[in-house]
Amino acid sequence: MAKFLREKPSNFKFSLHDAKIIDIDYDYGENRLIFKTQSGFIDIERNEMVDGEIILEGVSWEDSYVYIMEYKNVLTGNVGSFIGEKMYLSNFVDAFYSKFGSFDVMSEYDSYMTYMLSGFLKRGSEELEANIEIFYNGDIIYNVRG
């Protein structure tokens, strides 16, 4: 039996862990998605926050989804019952500015043509849990200010 090892990528320079996304912009013509943060994101090598925005290119809108979970009788993020909704990423982006206040990133995952964010979504005074699953075939660009 042949054994193949899948190595973990070692070239991650930035992390969105603890980033607060306050706006999401998109360009359907160019299939680009832009995450704008309140305080930036982590520069892993320097272990500090840097200001900027994140751009995903080659987004497939019909293959990208957002899962929103509203917990019942338990604090958001804990084990327990919830009700939820799965929606197209495009519908979520259209509603983000008017319906949601921000998205606090807890973790991110980048794999072959799939980029996922999980965290907590603000809706008024409510905290919801959300997973954003983006199918893409382009680059991830970190525009760093300063």
Regions found by a protein language model. Name each.
Residues M1-G146:
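Surface-exposed, interaction-prone regions used to assemble/regulate multi-protein complexes
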